[in-house]
A protein has these predicted regions:
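Residue-level recognition of tetratricopeptide repeat
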Residues: 31-32, 65, 99, 133, ...
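Canonical positions in the second alpha-helix
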Residues: 25-26, 57-58, 91-92, 125-126, ...
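Register position in tetratricopeptide repeats
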Residues: 12, 44, 78-79, 112-113, ...
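Structural marker of alpha-solenoid helical repeat scaffolds
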Residues: 28-29, 61, 94-95, 129, ...
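TPR alpha-solenoid repeat register
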Residues: 34, 68, 102, 136, ...
Length: 414
């Protein structure tokens, strides 16, 4: 390991020219085992070209060592040198001990370029040679997972888990949970998330588990996992929204608002946080707070339709007519129009006794709300008040079609 320390320092400094010279000298002076170790180190630090140079040197010295060809092929694939990789793998004979691994490398390549049937064929060929090899079964499971065959993938991984197979760097319980979750089988995923969390309460696993519990409406448990997540990783931003939604489902709106404002404190540029905070504030009856949150959401995205609609509806409901009109004018300056605001603006101008503007927006709204009986009724009485009887007659005829059981519309025509 001592011989690797100078390489680590040079790689951390990013001095490629010096590194090349050191690699050349190492290939002349040191033994093959240490050279192979250097190739691993270079790969680990991302110096792929230098790792290839080292392995090519070893492959020249030991052409019968097929593992070197596989290592080279994998590095060539990282550099998108598919032809070089395929040529290297084609030199491995079927009777070689390394042939199953070569097939697995080919399967990875075909999976990467989307030729899933070819990839599966290569894996099956390798399994036929080594039927008890867990790594090959796992590779097949991953392929099934990627191609959306979730139940098959989960069953295969469960068999691996039951056989006590251990794969370096793989938590089979977590993998099974992820597969079931991807297939929306959250009930089946939950026991495996629980197993995975007993080994390590990693932030991503806590989030995934929290989401699974949320999906099956076990909100208290979801909140427990999400609170734990945010305690150990306050910068796991998506945890705040899910926690707030969880509290909202429990009708703990104060806690929901607290969770989402914590999220805003961590990420003040996430418009969805402000929208959610606005909605929860409305549920709590805090109109002014809701207005502030919604205004912030729109400031971040002037075309954020959900926030615009809710704020417009709030202004209309509270008869904050001037605020509604100001919002519309501000959006118009941004070259953004939202037709769902037209009925609200018509009512606002009518309340302000600005009848010409009200009529203008009623007409604009009419084109898209001809089947909205509530809007048409308002428009009808506005037209009658304004003396526009012919236009009112047209609206009455439409209301008769929409609400034939309402005698009021027929009485008006008599």
């Amino acid at each position: 390991m001592e011989k690797m320390i100078p390489f680590i320092r040079v790689m951390e400094d990013g001095d490629i020219e010096k590194l090349d010279g050191m690699v050349d000298a190492f290939l002349l002076e040191e033994n093959p085992d240490e050279q192979y170790g250097l190739a691993d180190l270079l790969t680990e630090y991302g110096f792929i070209q230098e790792a290839i140079k080292t392995l090519e040197h070893l492959n020249f010295l030991f052409p019968e060592e097929d593992q070197l060809k596989i290592d080279l092929a994998q590095l060539f694939l990282e550099l998108n040198k598919e032809d070089d990789a395929l040529e290297m793998l084609s030199n491995i004979e079927k009777n070689s001990e390394s042939y199953p691994q070569a097939l697995l490398t080919l399967a990875d390549y075909y999976q990467m370029i989307g030729l899933y049937e070819v990839a599966e064929h290569k894996i099956e060929e390798a399994i036929a040679l080594l039927p008890g090899e867990p790594l090959l079964q796992y590779a097949k499971g991953e392929l099934l997972f990627e191609t959306g065959r979730y139940l098959e993938a989960a069953r295969l991984m469960e068999d691996l888990l039951a056989s006590k197979s251990e794969l370096q760097g793989v938590d089979l319980s977590l993998k099974i949970a992820e597969i079931y979750s991807a297939g929306a089988a959250y009930e089946e995923a939950i026991p495996y998330y629980t197993e995975a969390l007993q080994k390590e309460a990693a932030p991503e696993v806590l989030f995934q588990a929290g989401y699974a519990f949320f999906q099956v409406r076990q909100y208290e448990t979801a909140a427990k996992h999400l609170n734990h997540l945010l305690e150990i990783d306050p910068d796991f931003f998506s945890g705040y929204m899910l926690l707030a939604e969880t509290y909202a489902m429990l009708e703990k709106n104060e806690e929901a608002l607290s969770a989402i404002t914590d999220g805003i404190a961590r990420d003040e540029f996430e418009k969805e946080y402000y929208l959610f905070a606005g909605k929860i504030s409305l549920k709590l009856g805090r109109v002014k707070e809701a207005e502030g949150f919604l205004q912030e959401a729109i400031a971040l995205d002037p075309e954020y339709m959900d926030a615009i609609y809710i704020l417009s509806s709030l202004f209309s409901q509270e008869e904050m007519d001037e605020e509604l009109i100001d919002l519309y004018e501000t959006l118009k300056q941004e070259q953004f129009e939202m037709s769902s605001m037209y009925p609200l603006l018509a009512s606002a101008y009518e309340r302000l006794e600005m009848y010409e503007k009200a009529y203008e927006f009623y007409k604009l709204a009419y084109t898209e709300h001809k089947e909205d009986a509530a809007f048409l009724e308002k428009y009808l009485y506005f037209l009658l008040e304004d003396g526009k009887r012919e236009e009112a007659r047209e609206i009455i005829l439409i209301l008769q079609e929409l609400q034939p059981e309402n005698s009021e519309w027929f009485d008006m025509m008599e």
